[in-house]
């Protein structure tokens, strides 16, 4: 396995090196991880046992990668395509056609405007349907809104900004009457022989408003918060009751920055391990929760594999010497409903490990743990 291989190499090689020349803002957390592992850092071009890219392998770096048969690389070629919500759900929908029961951890999803007819039929047959719409290339919760009843799509707007629309999960598991989700990290290794790993330490992100079903009134946002939401492109719905995004909830006067997160469990961001204990107290089978998350990661790895293998051989070539030396860390956003079912909300192909601008202590602490583990 790649991790065991890296550990064996690092023990045999006196100066096991990680090249941070291409890592930009992530070099700080890499420096910490190398200190913990006893590894060396280098910025020399073409040098290192691990070459860390922030974005991916660029065209002028391909020859270097091909020639470094001993190097290990953290970005699969053209993996950025999978970051697009639209492309991701088109991929999963194709698999669901062949394996209808395999991907039931994903809410029913419409890719718009392509699925307009199915989208319209859904509202006609499900009168109480509530869908949550997300821009295909959106981030930080921007541009998200709810569809509570059928309304014709603005076809021109859809062409400018493609959307996905998903069945809203109306029964989230609540802690302190707040909705929450998890950001976990999993890693795919190798090309022709693929392996997957998951780190069961991550972050749990809480809404700052008590949960209110989407049909309820949203009058509990004060004028200052509503104006801030408008400035950042958020809809009029009280998204602070529904979206856990830090970029949204940090603007709330109710945001709790708990720097003593190792001892207390009342912050708007908490450790995954802390929240799992609270879930267990509420009757959630944590072993099953972990098993369900592993099942999601396994199926995502299988779904991604043809794309990753195909683009690897197109860009790098059929080199058996180096194709097992590639790995990629993904950010996985999941939530649990009050029936204890685990749902996949989103996957991030380029989760940030930048610790420079983190405003609360739990962020760099969690990112460092993920890098080391």
Language-model segments: what does each one mean?
Residues 118, 122-332, 336-343, 348, ...:
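Catalytic core of tubulin tyrosine ligase-like
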